[in-house]
Curated annotation (Swiss-Prot):
Domain of life of the organism encoding this protein: Bacteria
Organism from which the protein derives: Escherichia coli O157:H7
Subunit (UniProt): Heterotetramer of two alpha chains (FadB) and two beta chains (FadA).
UniProt keyword list: Acyltransferase, Cytoplasm, Fatty acid metabolism, Lipid degradation, Lipid metabolism, Transferase
Main location (coarse class): cytoplasm
Name of the protein in its database record: 3-ketoacyl-CoA thiolase
E.C. code: 2.3.1.16
GO cellular component, as recorded: cytoplasm
HAMAP family documented for this protein: FadA
Entry's family note: Belongs to the thiolase-like superfamily. Thiolase family.
Gene: fadA
MF annotations from Gene Ontology: acetyl-CoA C-acyltransferase activity
Enzyme class of the recorded protein, top EC level: transferase
Pfam families referenced in this protein's UniProt entry, alphabetically: Thiolase_C, Thiolase_N
Family matches, as NCBIfam families: AcCoA-C-Actrans (TIGR01930), fadA (TIGR02445), PRK08947.1 (NF006510)
Length: 387
């Protein structure tokens, strides 16, 4: 079986969804920009040699509809002979895109794939056109379709207080701002055209979603967003609404060596699981355990984790049940996470994997794990090994 390697990984800056940098930039353009950039950064690979493009996107309608992967590839002037498919596993879409490409390479059906994902939550809101089947409530709690309420449920089940959530959210912003200031994101962010507050076209090379002024005291003043009477989850402890894209160049190890391209990491194992939709945010726990089992590793073998921060109330129970509470500041989301950077749904799987690869190199660790919860009760995880 072929070894699957990541040759390169990049992303756009994360733009605010409400009147942000990409308010006049379409999702296809964000995607095409990264496709062009990945190929330009790796000229040893001819675009025509790509076997397929796998691109995650959740709200596949309006500008994100009609197979955005193919639309973006055509905009990027990728040769018409290269196919492209859009992948949807909700929040895990672009990580699923990576898994799909990896399996193709493992079986010998492909040698080089471009993977990634996008979501423009300013142009296509998460709730746009959603129409749940009325009979679904016979099998699943109606509130399971409301992500904020599932986070409230997890917080109550695991004893996660409002204070703990506020502290974690403040940490996310502080870490992300420190990473920005130190240049830790420089290797992953591709400068991307957008408009500033005055409407002037400029190149953005930083995440505009981060709020460096965030404090625990300020967060404590916010009202509960989903359960006004008894809730603890606020807008400040939820992932920010943002627009962005991320992309990775994935190849067989043998093809990378043939072309003289240096792999950054191997895909050591992959896992996806289902869980109770009412606690959809718990998915990373069984997904991570399964991925570690497939890799023949334990939690203690992983040097650094990227866990998508859908909500502080959601990620803290996962950290707790993976036995990592005492190691948060050594191993978990060291450059902040979605609370600070935002969670553009179809982009996030590739985004956290990209950030993880850079952290693994910076911290000089052998193994890293990226994992995320998925709406309606799923979890997805990938174990990476540095080459």
């Amino acid at each position: 079986m072929e070894q699957v390697v990541i040759v390169d990984a990049i992303r756009t800056p994360m733009g605010r969804s409400k009147g942000g940098a990409f308010r006049n930039v379409r999702a296809e353009d964000l995607s095409a920009h990264l496709m062009r950039s990945l190929l330009a950064r790796n000229p040893a690979l001819e675009a025509a040699a790509l076997d397929d493009i796998y691109w995650g996107c959740v709200q596949q309608t309006l500008e994100q509809g009609f197979n955005i992967a193919r639309n973006a590839a055509l905009l990027a002037e990728v040769p018409h002979s290269v196919p492209a498919v859009t992948v949807n596993r909700l929040c895990g879409s672009s990580m699923q895109a990576l898994h799909d490409a990896a399996r193709m390479i493992m079986t010998g059906d492909a040698q080089a794939c471009l993977v990634g994902g996008v979501e423009h939550m300013g142009h296509v809101p998460m709730s746009h056109g959603v129409d749940f089947h009325p009979g679904l409530s016979r099998n699943v709690a109606k509130a399971a379709g409301m992500m904020g309420l599932t986070a409230e449920m997890l917080a109550r089940m695991h004893g996660i207080s409002r204070e703990m959530q506020d502290a974690f959210a403040a940490r996310s912003h502080a870490r992300a701002w420190a990473a920005t200031q130190s240049g830790a994101f420089k290797n992953e962010i591709i400068p991307t055209g957008g408009h500033d507050a005055d409407g002037v076209l400029k190149q953005f090379n930083y995440d505009e979603v981060i709020r460096p002024e965030t404090t625990v005291e300020a967060l404590a003043t916010l009202r509960p967003a989903f359960d006004p009477v008894n809730g603890t989850v606020t807008a400040g402890t939820s992932s920010a609404l943002s627009d962005g894209a991320a992309a990775m160049l994935v190849m067989s190890e043998s093809r990378a060596h043939e072309l003289g391209l240096k792999p950054r990491a191997r895909v050591r194992s992959m896992a996806v699981v289902g869980c109770d939709p009412s606690i959809m945010g718990y998915g990373p726990v069984p997904a991570s355990k399964l991925a570690l089992k497939k890799a023949g590793l334990s939690v203690s073998d992983i040097g650094v984790f990227e866990m998508n921060e859908a909500f502080a109330a959601q990620i803290l129970p996962c950290i707790k049940d993976l036995g990592l509470i005492e190691q948060i500041d050594e191993k978990i989301n060291l450059n902040g996470g979605a609370i600070a950077l935002g969670h553009p749904l179809g982009c996030s799987g590739a985004r956290i994997s990209t950030t993880l690869l850079n952290l693994m190199e910076h911290k000089d660790v052998q193994f890293g794990l990226a994992t995320m919860c998925i709406g309606l009760g799923q979890g997805i995880a990938t174990v990476f090994e540095r080459v």
